Amino acid sequence: MRKKYMLGLMLFTMMTLPFMAGCGANQAGTNNTSTAQPQAETNSAGAKATEPAKKDGEQVVNVFTARHYDVDSKLFGEFTKQTGIKVNEVKGTAEELVERLKREGESSEADLFITVDGGVLNYAKQNGVLQPIQSAEVDKHVPQELRDKDNEWIGMATRARVIVYAKDRVKPEQLSTYEDLANDKWKGKVLVRSSSNLYNQSLVASFIELNGEQEAEAWAKGLVNNFARKPEGGDRDQAKAIAAKAGDVAIMNTYYVGQMLHSKDAEEVKVAENIGVFFPNQNTTGTHLNISGIGLAKHAKHKENAIKLIEFITGKEGQTLLTQGSFEFPVNKEADKPALLTEWGEFKTQQLDFAKLGEHNKKAVELLNKVGWK
């Protein structure tokens, strides 16, 4: 019996460790001047003190969120202003929140679960803590490719993982694909954050899905050989390293560029002004896209209010407010995008089921360790 218990514990640890490492690594390179940060709150999700007591007759919706972007709170505030429904936020890592939802079961006060990465959203679904979102409005707002096949989670915003480059040292016509960064011509010029970062794990997971494990490994190995330095810091730090001439190109998420360009820190603005953004693989598989998303908690006690909040977040007004602050791409095509995103124009994206990012996460982590991507 003890052997079975230990085996189960080991399997559980192996399944959850990649996600925990990835999300925890997102804490690197944060900056208080930004409008949004990619990492989850480090506060314990088990602290009941984080949940305001409900007053008699008060309309509420309880949101368990692994995002702690300032713009999200503004979004919730606007929803409350328009509907009178108070939004209570409980923050933690995605893994903490999912485990809490499982542990509390029917007694859980959670109505919504919000996090980043399609693989993590599918992880929540696989753990049985979500239920289908039934709303014609949401179906109209969010295209099918940005929704779970059973509608247990939907995208609320997207972000592209692109190549950024030094405008004074690299011409955009020198760039083409992610695969090309493994070419010898980029020897000692590529900057990237750690393999423990979920964004990089999901990028590699997408290559495994689209190109096969063998090609994904060959690419990662070639990229490691071209590193300008040992991976360190967050996405902003890669841009700053380009400015410091530590390397010429880097892989980072688009929304960081928007945040840096609109930062209160003059140095961040200067760094962002001197890097170019390139959307790779336009003639092949497309640029890697990932999502921030929402799931409806299985035992939501304020289901109607939760659906109303999802409809607001994915509606034109909510999408405009969200993306103007986070510089993510809206999922609702009717939303007014920030001028910067409009300037970047339309681009081809990878066509894959976001659930595959989670399914291939373990292989991606093993592959990254194998090729020496620290």
Model-derived segments and spans:
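An extracytoplasmic/periplasmic, membrane-proximal ligand-sensing/linker region
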Residues: 215-218, 327-374
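Periplasmic solute-binding protein
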Residues: 118-129, 146-176, 201-205, 289-295
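Ligand-binding pocket segment of bilobal, Venus flytrap-like solute-binding proteins
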Residues: 206, 212-278
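Mature extracytoplasmic/periplasmic domains
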Residues: 292-351
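Short, low-complexity disordered leader/linker segments with a strong preference
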Residues: 1-60
